[in-house]
């Protein structure tokens, strides 16, 4: 029986809110009904979920929202307004909400707080008696996780009790007893055999609740009644103008924002400081002359009005500034030409001081000409003032590591609030140092203790940034992995003291050991860790000198490097033979001392530091960590010593999983937590790389397991890890579904790997975008060699957690293709070809070129939006392109060979043939490619005869109305896209839905452009077209920009509102809605001049000036899925098969340039009830829209005979669609076969019906919403 709970709230104006919440007995879902009575208009429910043990709002897992909460509009039902929520997240313990009156922009709360309703969960413990066998199996798993130690009776009882607690907790989370039984099998112990990898067979059933590891960091919701945070800076810039703006900086503290704009006004430095604080507010400030850390009293001649001097500072009152929508306060300070380098301030408001999280607000000032910089660089990703100052201070930094870390601390403090660019700049500088591109010591003697203390100050600041700015955590991790931990007190001093003890105990006070002793006293560094390891290997090998040099050289230390120290090491080690044991003991202990300071990523050192109490705080007790972590860490240390890679891989990740909750929100000793996690990750990477050598990629269970663990490790390593988490959940799904030699399993697994490849490629590109510009700029300033600069980001990526996953995916892919009966080619457009090979990075770069001889393009990247250049007979690419994308359709229409290659070796071989001729023949198994020769005459003929002959577009006249209804559509007023909608509406059966439509007919654009209000725009377009006709394609963008400046006649607005309301479309016609729709209309018109469309017209010998653009207006169907049907299989040419591709959300991800593949299936027309899936989805993004209007291009040349115009022009949604990362792990299309067959059969039947109406093959676009089929477009299939 379901349990329920009701609550009532008496609201303002006599309104009453009644809530009934029902929880089902299986604990899997909750239904909440909100009934708002006695109200006259629809309110909005602004809500979020509360999880057990947490007071923050969370978004239930089946939804997505960028704002951190969800908004649901009440719907009229009888005499009340109703919202019904269904939640399937068993973690939800309460729903909190407020009510929003959208029409009056006001909020309704309960006593200045949130309304709250508890979820009536059943007492699951009382309903389930856990079988003893299940408890024993779980206890066995707990014992196995600990490494199967010899356990006493008491330890066995502890495992049993822990098993009971775990099972009760899982039942409380909504997991059924049957599921627990199914997942509780204990692997049967078998005798060891000589067969490799045998122990991996049972291990692949690994699964964690990775959703708990989600990290998404976005701007917090603004809850103040003042100016929104995103608006204050814009208001300030509107107030002072942007023409003289030098820099901009914003601070966010609680609900307050402070914006500081620096301007250059006739050579004077002017500061505009604005805040959204209310009431009397005072700026308490000082200036800096020589360094940002100074606080000096400003000179009297720079004081603004309402200022006074107080106790070593100046205080200035803010002035109110109000507008119709917003109000804020400001101060305008003219620092003139005083040569100040910065200012510091705090603010007094509301009876207390406002500061920057315990520190002063600091603003570094820039000279007006500093923005020009010393080198050409894109400032979007580079904090130039920081890099310039690093360059200027490098001479000081190279004196010693103490100097370098002290300067790094100072600069990091100054730049930490200036976006990611600041932290990236520091990381790049530290990496140039760590890779020995910079000098570590020059003519300066510094104690190890001083280096250690300087390093600790730097890492303490990194810890602070990690805690306060979660979006920078990846960069902070990269930085801390490059440096040591540092330490106060005797930590650094022990380096100096213990070397003397080693020399005395082992009688080695001269030679190499004395040279090293002098080097350690003068300037200890990370090199000393390597030297100590080399000495240990030398001693352990019975004093073989080659072991010493091999260790040094493996780690990048050469004889020249040793000799270059201020205190050079030029001698080789020489020890007494009877000192071996003492040296091993003493050097081993000394290595720990060195690593404690210089090697933050050393695992043993990190574990020892982590487990030791610090300042009375035990890290486990304070951070709420499980004792299981301590067992895992001790086990890891043992496995590392044993070099047992198979169990070590799993235990390293298990340790990170146990550490992760504390690492996300540490209460104390965050630096120790972070260094431990970095060390675990580093050890994992090293171990898995060793494991790669012996992996059998033809044994799927083994590879499934390894990829599983690597994915979990990656989830734990990156910020904004939502998509990797979804891929990991999907990988769990295919792991559990594994069946040997199962084709459908291989296709599903291939789709997951395809998506992973896209995610990893995108992540690499992101790193190149944000890191490489800084590396290039700073590297040139510091005179780093060109190779070191060029490979900088590549080396960062290869050292990261994604590199090994990329290797695994690439090596497993051929095995999967073999199981799935896939070759190395997917043929998208089948045609034989002969041509000369040309290699390009991106097809779009050459889309407007004309090749005078038949050309085969090998393009590293194709998006699906491009036009194939004239003269090209084939396009080969590794990019995964949908068969029904626009570029695919145009390739088939032009009889151009178009194919995706999955084998990098094949592709590399083809690229090596650049400049030479090749022949391509299409077979049922893929492509057969050979070197070109004189026998390819027939293929050459194909090239010559396939050049389009040219179809003349016929101009269209304006009908006298700006907007017409679908009943008024004729082929003289609208294009085939609109006319076909009218044709279909009159003929399709009732179960096929057609969305409501209207149109702006042909000639509307030309008529409005000729209006007097647009004469300047018309004149500008005419001039630009003259240049365009002379071959200047750069004018295309200028024409589009000019069209966006057009003004609309009032009659257009009135007609649009009238027609759309008569068609019952969701169009309010208010000022905001009109403005958005007018912009969308102009964007559709402007798309006539996009480069792709213009080049296509010229290539096909069409008169571009004769192209007319109608605009089809349709209601956006906010569906579950979107699909495209070709009723004649375009891949095989089989007219008895219907080919369909389907995606989640809106169809733009299918036909547009969105990476990944759609799900595809074929259906025999003679057996519509038996669709066959031929590929599973790897699309990363789903597009979702609220009820809105779409404006579709409908030109007079898109569907002419012999010309495929699909996708040449743009369609624009009035309200921007939201991009949502897709989670396929529970997708019914994949998981529920009966649902899939029903839906696919209905789609195929709709395609068959429409083909029969037209009597020829059709290209159909449609939407699935609530099980209903909507057709939004149909055209003849080319």
From Swiss-Prot:
InterPro entries: ATP_grasp_subdomain_1, CWD_DUF7067, GWD-like_N_Ig, GWD1_pHisD, PPDK_AMP/ATP-bd. It catalyses: [(1->4)-alpha-D-glucosyl](n) + n ATP + n H2O = [(1->4)-6-phospho-alpha-D-glucosyl](n) + n AMP + n phosphate + 2n H(+). Residues 1-23 form the signal peptide. Keywords: ATP-binding, Carbohydrate metabolism, Kinase, Magnesium, Metal-binding, Nucleotide-binding, Signal, Transferase. The keyword ATP-binding applies. Its EC number is 2.7.9.4. Belongs to the PEP-utilizing enzyme family. Homodimer. PANTHER family: ALPHA-GLUCAN WATER DIKINASE 1, CHLOROPLASTIC-RELATED, ALPHA-GLUCAN WATER DIKINASE 2. This is Alpha-glucan water dikinase 2. The gene is GWD2.
């Amino acid at each position: 029986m379901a349990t329920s709970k009701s609550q009532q709230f008496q609201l303002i104006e006599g309104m009453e809110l009644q809530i009934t919440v029902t929880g089902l007995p299986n604990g899997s879902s909750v239904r909440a009904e909100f009934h708002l009575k006695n109200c006259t208009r629809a309110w909005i429910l602004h809500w979020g979920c509360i999880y057990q043990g947490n007071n923050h709002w969370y978004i239930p897992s089946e939804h997505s929202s960028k704002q951190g909460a969800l908004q649901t509009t009440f719907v009229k039902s009888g005499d009340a307004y109703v919202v019904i929520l269904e939640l399937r997240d068993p973690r939800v313990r309460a729903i909190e909400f407020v009510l929003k009156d959208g029409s009056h922009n006001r909020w309704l709360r309960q006593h200045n707080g949130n309304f709250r309703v508890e979820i009536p969960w059943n007492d699951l413990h009382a309903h389930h008696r856990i079988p003893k066998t299940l408890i024993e199996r779980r206890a066995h798993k707990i014992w196995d996780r600990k490494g199967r130690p010899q356990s006493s009776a008491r330890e066995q009882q502890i495992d049993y009790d822990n098993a009971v607690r775990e099972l009760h907790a899982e039942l409380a989370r909504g997991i059924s007893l049957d599921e627990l039984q199914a997942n509780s099998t204990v692997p049967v112990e078998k005798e060891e055999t000589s067969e490799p990898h045998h122990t991996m067979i049972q291990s692949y059933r690994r699964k964690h609740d990775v959703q708990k590891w989600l990290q998404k960091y976005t701007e917090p919701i603004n809850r103040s009644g003042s100016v929104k945070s995103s608006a204050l800076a814009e208001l300030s810039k509107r107030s002072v103008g942007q023409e003289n703006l030098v820099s901009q900086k914003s601070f966010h503290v609680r609900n307050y924002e402070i914006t500081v704009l620096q301007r250059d006004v006739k050579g004077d430095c002017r500061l505009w400081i604005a805040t959204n604080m209310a009431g009397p507010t005072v700026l308490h400030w000082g200036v800096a002359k020589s360094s940002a850390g100074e606080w000096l009293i400003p000179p009297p001649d720079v004081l603004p009005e309402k200022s006074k001097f107080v106790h070593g500072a100046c205080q200035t009152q803010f002035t109110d500034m109000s507008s119709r929508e917003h109000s804020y306060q400001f101060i305008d300070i003219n620092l003139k030409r005083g040569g100040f380098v910065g200012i510091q301030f705090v603010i007094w408001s509301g009876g207390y001081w406002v500061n920057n999280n315990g520190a002063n607000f600091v603003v570094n000032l820039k000279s007006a000409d500093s923005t020009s910089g010393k080198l050409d660089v894109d400032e979007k990703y580079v904090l130039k003032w920081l890099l310039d100052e690093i360059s200027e201070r490098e001479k000081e930094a190279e004196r010693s590591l103490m100097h370098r870390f002290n300067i790094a601390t100072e600069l990091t403090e100054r730049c930490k609030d200036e976006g990611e660019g600041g932290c990236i700049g520091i990381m790049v500088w530290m990496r140039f140092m760590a890779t020995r591109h910079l000098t570590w010591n020059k003519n300066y003697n510094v104690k190890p203790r001083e280096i250690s203390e300087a390093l600790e100050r730097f890492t303490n600041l990194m810890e602070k940034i990690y805690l306060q700015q979660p979006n920078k955590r990846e960069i902070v991790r990269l930085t801390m992995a490059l440096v040591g931990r540092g330490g106060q007190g005797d930590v650094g001093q022990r380096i100096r003291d213990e070397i003397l003890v080693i020399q005395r105990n082992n009688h080695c006070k001269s030679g190499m050991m004395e040279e090293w002793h002098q080097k350690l006293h003068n300037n200890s560094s990370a090199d000393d860790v390597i030297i100590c390891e080399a000495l240990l290997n030398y001693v352990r090998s019975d004093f073989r000198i080659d072991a010493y040099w091999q260790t040094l050289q493996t780690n990048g230390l050469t004889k020249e490097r040793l000799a270059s120290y201020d205190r050079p090491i030029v001698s080789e080690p020489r020890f007494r033979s009877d000192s071996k044991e003492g040296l091993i003991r003493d050097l081993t202990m000394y290595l720990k001392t060195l690593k404690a300071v210089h090697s933050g990523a050393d695992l043993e050192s990190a574990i020892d530091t982590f487990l030791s109490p610090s300042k009375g705080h035990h890290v486990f007790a304070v951070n709420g960590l499980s004792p299981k972590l301590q067992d895992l860490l001790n086990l890891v240390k043992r496995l590392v010593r044993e070099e047992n890679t198979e169990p070590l891989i799993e235990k390293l990740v298990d340790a990170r999983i146990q550490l992760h909750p504390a690492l996300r929100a540490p209460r104390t000793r965050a630096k120790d937590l972070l260094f431990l996690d970095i060390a675990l990750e580093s050890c994992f990477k090293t171990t898995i790389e060793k494991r790669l050598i012996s992996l059998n990629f033809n044994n799927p269970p083994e590879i499934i397991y390894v990829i599983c663990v690597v994915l979990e490790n990656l989830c734990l390593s990156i910020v904004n890890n939502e998509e990797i988490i979804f891929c990991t959940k999907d990988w769990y799904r295919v792991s559990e579904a594994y069946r040997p030699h199962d084709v459908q399993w291989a296709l599903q697994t291939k789709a997951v790997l395809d998506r992973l490849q896209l995610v990893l490629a995108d992540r690499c590109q992101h790193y190149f975008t944000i890191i490489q510009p800084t590396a290039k700029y700073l590297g040139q300033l510091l005179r780093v060699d060109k190779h070191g600069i060029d490979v900088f980001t590549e080396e960062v990526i290869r050292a990261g957690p994604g590199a090994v996953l990329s290797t695994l995916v690439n090596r497993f892919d051929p095995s999967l293709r073999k199981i799935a009966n896939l070759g190395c080619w997917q043929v998208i457009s089948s045609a034989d070809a002969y041509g000369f090979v040309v290699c390009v990075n991106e097809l779009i770069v050459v889309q407007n070129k004309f090749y005078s001889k038949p050309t085969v393009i090998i393009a590293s990247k194709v998006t699906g939006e491009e036009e194939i250049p004239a003269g090209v007979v084939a396009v080969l690419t590794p990019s995964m392109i949908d068969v029904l994308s626009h570029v695919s359709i145009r390739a088939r229409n032009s009889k151009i060979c178009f194919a995706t290659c999955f084998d990098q070796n094949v592709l590399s071989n083809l690229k090596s043939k650049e400049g030479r001729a090749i022949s391509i023949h299409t077979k049922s198994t893929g492509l057969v490619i050979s070197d070109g020769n004189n026998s390819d005459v027939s293929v050459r003929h194909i090239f010559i005869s396939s050049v389009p002959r040219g179809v003349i577009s016929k101009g269209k006249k304006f009908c006298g109305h700006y907007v017409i209804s679908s009943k008024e559509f004729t082929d003289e007023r609208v294009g085939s896209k609109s006319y076909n909608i009218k044709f279909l509406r009159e003929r399709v059966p009732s179960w096929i839905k057609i969305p409501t439509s209207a149109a702006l007919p042909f000639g509307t654009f030309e008529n409005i452009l000729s209006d007097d209000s647009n004469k300047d725009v018309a004149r500008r377009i005419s001039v630009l077209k003259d240049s365009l006709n002379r071959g200047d394609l750069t004018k295309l963008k200028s024409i589009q920009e000019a069209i966006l400046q057009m003004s609309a006649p009032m009659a257009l607005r009135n007609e649009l509102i009238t027609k759309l309301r008569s068609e019952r479309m969701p169009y309010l016609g208010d000022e905001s809605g009109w403005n958005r729709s007018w912009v969308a209309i102009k964007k559709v018109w402007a798309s006539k001049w996009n480069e792709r469309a213009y080049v296509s017209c010229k290539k096909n010998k069409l008169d571009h000036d004769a192209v007319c653009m109608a605009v089809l207006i349709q209601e956006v169907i906010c569906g579950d899925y979107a699909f495209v049907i070709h009723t004649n299989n375009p891949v095989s040419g089989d007219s008895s098969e219907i080919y369909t591709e389907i995606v989640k959300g809106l169809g733009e991800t299918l036909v547009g340039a969105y990476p990944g593949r759609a799900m595809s299936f074929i259906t025999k027309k003679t057996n519509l009830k038996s669709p066959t899936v031929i590929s599973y989805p790897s699309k990363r993004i789903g597009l979702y829209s609220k009820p809105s209007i779409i404006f579709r291009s409908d030109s007079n040349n898109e569907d002419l005979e012999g010309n495929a115009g699909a996708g040449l022009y743009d369609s624009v949604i009035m309200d921007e669609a939201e991009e949502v990362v897709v989670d396929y792990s529970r997708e019914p299309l994949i998981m529920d076969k009966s649902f899939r067959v029903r839906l696919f059969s209905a789609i195929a039947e709709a395609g068959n019906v429409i083909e029969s109406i037209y009597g020829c093959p059709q290209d159909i676009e449609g939407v699935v919403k609530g099980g209903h089929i909507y057709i939004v477009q149909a055209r003849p299939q080319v």
